């Protein structure tokens, strides 16, 4: 938009806006933040603001919109959630004291990856900013949640791993130092990831050296430096809560591509994108927001270290065995607020009095938790409790300073206890004395004037005043009262005596409020020195919260403690899908065993659609993941290897936004397993080859099975409708056939949902189509085609034919075939809802059907 003729204030605005062209500029004017020109036009649409104009009388009025400064956070969050950046421009001096134009400047650039304000729905969500640097030999990745100060860093060799990490982390913003292709930029933006350029800062900053202190790898150091510089440049303040960066190897954890996590629905449903319906939803019995976030992190990075897994299991077992200890801990955890994010607000300087009191209450609750653990009688719980520092002195300093129920704002007074400061107590005494004097004056003036409804009031414009109703104005003593304001129903007056005491009272109030804020700021700075200890305490309580949740899950859902095999064998007795089992009525889920000895690497699974093949496959993956995060699992017993990777081609939600066909996605995911799986991996393939010609698909599926068998050796569950593939067990020694049982009774298909040895004898595809409600004429045609194919032996693989000629004339003749019109009539009859018809209407329908049959 071309710039209009400007005032000095607008010149100042343009100078600041030029520095942040890609951000909405919230420009402080009095009690409002204003947006101008394109920002106003676009912002008014997104934020549903009234679009008005500045300088309406000029030839070129400037589009303008505004938001109250008290409500600015909600408007900023709305923009940031949609992927925009917001520059906050504040008045840097008191307008009353300014000489000329008020000095203004940017105090913070809020971006999707640096959002501090979190709503109730975000309490269990981490908000990651990720930094990526490219150097010879690979890429460094550092990511941080600014609200908690945590920083993690790793390095990878390949660019594809970078993209996978960004998607798996669900990072909100990536700072990328390098050339990003247009297609990758588009892919990230479609995943709601904002791509930003690195920032620059002059000189060295203490935060950088502090967070890098444990790092030795130059690539990781570069990634962390780029991350911290961006945070400092955007937040424009000290970031004392940033934690020492934790370096990790991706190979330390069970690796799962973003598509695998999505297919398995670990943290959100593939259909709704919400928590409900996910494994996280089932397991999340956590009490604190910190515990919920940690559980999510564990689900995305299951352990490979058997020692660490067993340590977690020990804690879960101890809590499972002691109901009363567990319940006491839960009760105490209810009094623990989000210490990690409270620490961040302390560091940012925007923590309010109530939040500091929440911190103190959390520390008091921590004392009870420690006492419960130490007195439990269990050595593991005792040791855990002894390792927690409750920060007792800090809690006392906060509670001794703040009143029990302080207001939210630290600038309005009424937050510091009596006895904390002698000067503050004197000011308050003066204020109270002044207010008593006002009450005494009001009573005396009523007596002097005879005006019973005379009252003394206050506002910020006139200060203290005497208000007299219109009916009593004649009684006002003109020699002492001076009229200051006339209202519809009353007049307001002042007296010399009232103004004299007003000055004393207001001076005491001003000094009291200023001193309270000073004392609060000192307390906040004292708390800031404890941030590292508070963050460590937050981590300990979060982990305890997850252990308690696992114990509750185990008790309520009858989970077992899994053991681990060094011989690469699986033995799950009566295993259940944790999510499906949770939503079905009690006792209705049919459990299944899964036993694969050391010599068996592939189970080839056949059976009809809807019979439960995919559920059975996912069940194993979810049980393995639960086991490797330290949880107990839904089974009577479970013995598992420690898997290093999980690969899936299940198709819970095909990722087609990149422009790839379903078959291309299928082949890409299959290739991931063939290229990277090891003998310690778990591979789940469902209907590989379905997206191409029949024989192409069958040939590819067979070749993939053979490669997995001969070259990879990973534990593999391979579901297929190509029944010809079941003959592979004759040549592949480590492959076995299993199938999902089904039976036919009176022409109806009944799913047994039970895994049985050997291949399925038929697929029951037409029966499933019938359950789906396909028209009878279609089902009849399909049955005819099936009989022709079976008669011709078309199920034998014939390399000379590329596609079955399904629509050639059908020579098979059925007994008493129905006409098409009769098929349609049967469809109509089957769809009638008798509960919605009157007896008379039913009789008329029957008559119509009889007539139709006679005409045919």
UniProtKB/Swiss-Prot annotation:
Alphabetized UniProt keyword annotations: ATP-binding, DNA damage, DNA repair, DNA-binding, Nucleotide-binding
Gene3D superfamilies named in the record: 1.10.1420.10, DNA repair protein MutS, domain I, MutS, connector domain, P-loop containing nucleotide triphosphate hydrolases
Top-level division of the source organism's lineage: Bacteria
GO MF annotations, alphabetized: ATP binding; ATP-dependent DNA damage sensor activity; damaged DNA binding; mismatched DNA binding
Keyword hit for Kinase: no
InterPro entries per the UniProt record, alphabetical: DNA_mismatch_repair_MutS, DNA_mismatch_repair_MutS-lik_N, DNA_mismatch_repair_MutS/MSH, DNA_mismatch_repair_MutS_C, DNA_mismatch_repair_MutS_clamp, DNA_mismatch_repair_MutS_core, DNA_mismatch_repair_MutS_N, DNA_mismatch_repair_MutS_sf
Binding site for ATP: 607-614
Protein's GO biological process: mismatch repair
Pfam families, alphabetized: MutS_I, MutS_II, MutS_III, MutS_IV, MutS_V
Cellular component, GO, one term: cytosol
Function: This protein is involved in the repair of mismatches in DNA. It is possible that it carries out the mismatch recognition step. This protein has a weak ATPase activity.
Family: Belongs to the DNA mismatch repair MutS family.
Protein name in the entry: DNA mismatch repair protein MutS
Taxonomic source organism: Lactobacillus delbrueckii subsp. bulgaricus (strain ATCC 11842 / DSM 20081 / BCRC 10696 / JCM 1002 / NBRC 13953 / NCIMB 11778 / NCTC 12712 / WDCM 00102 / Lb 14)
